[in-house]
Amino acid sequence: MIKYPILAIDYGTKNIGLAISDFKGLVAKPLEVLKVRNNNYKKCVEEILKIVECNKVQTILLGKPQIFEISQKKTLEKINAFEKILQEGVKLPIINYDESYSTVTAQDMLLYTRQTSKRRKEKIDSVAAAVFLQEFLNSNT
């Protein structure tokens, strides 16, 4: 049985987008974007731990895209390495979820917000995390 709230993580080599569900698992909302500095994912995991504690997170949803091209294999390998570091730190169940096209959907959504392109770019990763988290919530209710 899935426990709520869920923290969704949209992994990236430069940014990690975060989103969270409510305590009933009905609604996803974007949180923040963590900047990855010098490939230091342990620092990001420390930040994620703080968010987990503050929000009483019970489950992690880690976005993993489907592999369509050989070039994407390296991305998946990096996500798997990040997942190992994350698992050591958070000690919560981690569910892998296909987040393919979540960034494209998030870009479309943000176009209608009338924000500057710079502001949209700052939010894109957390909105993408919210997109695939909401898809997950909808499929599990």
Label the model's feature ranges:
Residues 2-7, 14-141:
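Phosphate- and other anionic-substrate recognition elements at nucleic-acid/protein interfaces
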